[in-house]
Amino acid sequence: VERDPIKTSFEKWAKPGHFSKTLSKGPNTTTWIWNLHADAHDFDSHTDDLEEISRKVFSAHFGQLAIILIWLSGMYFHGARFSNYEAWLSDPTHIKPSAQVVWPIVGQEILNGDVGGGFRGIQITSGFFQLWRASGITSELQLYCTAIGGLIFAGLMLFAGWFHYHKAAPKLAWFQDVESMLNHHLAGLLGLGSLSWAGHQVHVSLPINQLLDAGVDPKEIPLPHEFILNRDLLAQLYPSFAKGLTPFFTLNWSEYSDFLTFRGGLNPVTGGLWLTDTVHHHLAIAILFLIAGHMYRTNWSIGHSLKEILEAHKGPFTGEGHKGLYEILTTSWHAQLALNLAMLGSLTIVVAHHMYSMPPYPYLAIDYGTQLSLFTHHMWIGGFLIVGAAAHAAIFMVRDYDPTTQYNNLLDRVLRHRDAIISHLNWVCIFLGFHSFGLYIHNDTMSALGRPQDMFSDTAIQLQPIFAQWIQNTHASAPSLTAPDATASTSLTWGGGDLVAVGNKVALLPIPLGTADFLVHHIHAFTIHVTVLILLKGVLFARSSRLIPDKANLGFRFPCDGPGRGGTCQVSAWDHVFLGLFWMYNAISVVIFHFSWKMQSDVWGSISDQGVVTHITGGNFAQSSITINGWLRDFLWAQASQVIQSYGSSLSAYGLLFLGAHFVWAFSLMFLFSGRGYWQELIESIVWAHNKLKVAPAIQPRALSIVQGRAVGVAH
């Protein structure tokens, strides 16, 4: 650690652009404000010193954590101050969650709908109520305390960010000590983090949820600290607590099976995963990561060395294998970030799919709006992270890649046969696009000609997803075969099991897959492959291409390769990120359409006392979604028309947002299709008029560059 490396100066920070010689001189044209935003956090452009860059990134992480904690604190505060949480807790099947009441200004109070129990407010779909119930929060006071705790923690984070940059800044060697970092992150963050959460679940969540499920009034349930301090209270609910740690040390672990279970399926009272299953899961995860956190060699001569592992990693056809990658990952934070974003993005999308198929919190499964919101949220976040991975991989290629140290290793070999990779990927995209779209067009044509017997459908020419059905079947039959102690499969969606209904609403049931899913699946494959094609091309051609051999010298983002080189605009790595983002939006839109229609058609709905299920859209997915016309008529129009007709009701905000979102979308296209010269000419005639009237601005207006225009377009 280096002491007092940089003094704290508010005067310096107050000056816009203090991090750059050019920008700190102040504005000449309006481009200055764009560059200010573009470069403020581009630490590479402030200095070449890797240690200084590392310290800035490290310090910024604390700031990021502070922002997250302040946001979370706000969520908990709203739950404490403005919500009907206690009412919802006492009757979660009839009362809807609300944590915002609109003030009566210019008639906006129309937005406050009746959410049940005499409470009028906006219904929320964030899933916080369900999460709070699962973690054992029973009163608004507890939410207040947590909110205050969050703010205190945020303050600590802000202090830590300042302290570790201005007072005690780590040296470069500390940032590059990967084995120590792996040990501490795996054992500390993931291992002890999971263990402490498992502990909280056992001692607080389990007993409180057990009593809530049994219908005990939340106000009569003992407070969390009483369960922790008084073991007899827990022993009344879970008898093995009376035995203490004896079964643990005598290896009779099965004694604890009253609160560490392996049941599978859902709790029929709440429609959520069995809390005893999730405790068991977190305990197991903790053990795994605590072991993993002792695997890497630091002060003693045992354990893995990452450099040795990477350099030993050679295949028969891969030349030098992973030699040289260790140096890349310890000197290029962009390369490190690219890998982490790709993995975290993929994981986030996996989470999106588990939130509905294995709903982790009580009553989450019957709150359809929240289910849809959580799925959409996690899909979008995952998409952004994956595009970010490609962006930072390209920045690594332009700024940090040194071809002289990477000879005949895997990265070098991938770069050398990039033409084969990209052209094959291109062929795959063409194949998927024409075939998947062709299946729909065929169906539309046959439908229009009145020949249903010649359509691809479950009732005519079947294209059943046999592999997906085989996987479903394997999982559905697992409990009796591979997991004999489990009473149900991991997810009810696999099949076999009965449906779970809570409060006359379907929580979950086996999801049938048919021709319609097979068709839309190939649209997913198509859009994902196009996204990958664009992003990967951006990375592999970031340094050079046949068109522009010296691309690396032009940087990560540039509009064109100078005058006289026609057709070289929009070829920078940045432009590939832009186009990739565009296709990521395309891909995720189809995913969200598929999810919301499939769930409304085949899963969500009400159940009568006789056990008859009525789905929201009456099971029309299998026959309607096999034509383009069906998607337009029975999904997009059928659902959008309800939103558009919401004016004058408490849902009117959504109608206005719907309209506004399309306006913003159209606005973005204006920037994307704009001709820069056209705007520059327009601006200059307007400036001339200002000059005539002696009201000309001191800062000369300038049309957006291509890169800036695309930035505005993509943001909208």
Swiss-Prot record:
An annotated GO BP: photosynthesis
Ligand binding (chlorophyll a'): 662
Cofactor note: P700 is a chlorophyll a/chlorophyll a' dimer, A0 is one or more chlorophyll a, A1 is one or both phylloquinones and FX is a shared 4Fe-4S iron-sulfur center.
Name the record gives this protein: Photosystem I P700 chlorophyll a apoprotein A1
Subunit structure: The PsaA/B heterodimer binds the P700 chlorophyll special pair and subsequent electron acceptors. PSI consists of a core antenna complex that captures photons, and an electron transfer chain that converts photonic excitation into a charge separation. The eukaryotic PSI reaction center is composed of at least 11 subunits.
Source organism of this protein record: Araucaria araucana (Monkey-puzzle tree)
Disulfide bonds: none
Class of enzymatic activity (EC top level): oxidoreductase
TM stretches of this protein: 57-80, 143-166, 182-206, 278-296, 333-356, 372-398, 420-442, 518-536, 576-597, 651-673, 711-716
Pfam hit, one: PsaA_PsaB
Membrane association type: Multi-pass membrane protein
Keywords associated with the record: 4Fe-4S, Chlorophyll, Chloroplast, Chromophore, Electron transport, Iron, Iron-sulfur, Magnesium, Membrane, Metal-binding, Oxidoreductase, Photosynthesis, Photosystem I, Plastid, Thylakoid, Transmembrane, Transmembrane helix, Transport
